[in-house]
């Protein structure tokens, strides 16, 4: 059923500041004095409040006027309509504000004539704090986002880069080993051929030196007489 009566008003009433030992029967007796009731519901977890619903919204308004601030179930209760603008109880009024004194000083700047919440320095501080907080939050968000993105990129690019670098290193080391072994073998063969050629050339040179003909002896004219080729004929 609707909580609004035929006159269009609110039929449910909120009851606050109830004690933990509040009973349903005592609430029904207190509120049924103003009119017939539909339901009475008491909160248990957490305790301390209840809802009473009337059949007529005018009875609900009368109960709010008559029972607000009264002692029910051993405690002074607060009674108001459950929706709309709540009716303030005389026990829930805020404390009266201190009257303005021109001789009072502001504890922010030490000047007279205003309080801290009206001070221009206090308003500047609040603005700077809010700006610094928003700036630090945006910085933290940007840093966390960029860090997470860089981590994802690193994790994605790390495995192919590592595999490529490992394969390149292996191929380079193998080629270097091959070239080094080939150069060592070539140098060894060259040194051996050079040593052999040297060993062979040495005795040949000595032999050639020993076999070289001795210098020709020059025959003096006083030597043995030359033989004439043919005797002269006498006619």
From Swiss-Prot:
The keyword Zinc applies. SMART domains: RRM. Residues 11-84 form the RRM domain. This is Serine/arginine-rich splicing factor 7. Keywords: Acetylation, Cytoplasm, Isopeptide bond, Metal-binding, mRNA processing, mRNA splicing, mRNA transport, Nucleus, Phosphoprotein, Repeat, Repressor, RNA-binding, Transport, Ubl conjugation, Zinc, Zinc-finger. Residues 123-180, 187-219 have a biased composition (Basic residues). Its main location: nucleus. It comes from Bos taurus (Bovine). Belongs to the splicing factor SR family. The gene is SRSF7.
């Amino acid at each position: 059923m609707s909580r609004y009566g035929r006159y269009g008003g609110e039929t449910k009433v909120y009851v606050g500041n109830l004690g933990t030992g509040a009973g349903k029967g005592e609430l029904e007796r207190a509120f049924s004095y103003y009119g017939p009731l539909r339901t009475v519901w008491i909160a248990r977890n957490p305790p301390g409040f209840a809802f009473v619903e009337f059949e007529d919204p005018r009875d609900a308004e009368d109960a709010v006027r008559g029972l607000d601030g009264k002692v029910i179930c051993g405690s002074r209760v607060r009674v108001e309509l459950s929706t709309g603008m709540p009716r303030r109880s005389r026990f829930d009024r805020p404390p009266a504000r201190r009257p303005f004194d021109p001789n009072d000083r502001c504890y922010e700047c030490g000047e007279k004539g205003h309080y801290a919440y009206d001070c221009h320095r206090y308003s500047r501080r609040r603005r700077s704090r809010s700006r610094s907080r928003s700036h630090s939050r945006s910085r933290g968000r940007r840093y966390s986002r960029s860090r997470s993105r860089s981590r994802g990129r690193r994790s994605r690019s790390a495995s192919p880069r590592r595999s490529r670098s490992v394969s390149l290193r292996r191929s380079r080391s193998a080629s270097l080993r091959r070239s080094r072994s080939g150069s060592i073998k070539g140098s060894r063969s060259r040194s051996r051929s050079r040593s052999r050629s040297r060993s062979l050339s040495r005795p040949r040179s000595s032999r050639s030196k020993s076999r070289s003909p001795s210098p020709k002896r020059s025959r003096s004219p006083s030597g043995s007489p030359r033989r004439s080729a043919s005797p002269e004929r006498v006619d």
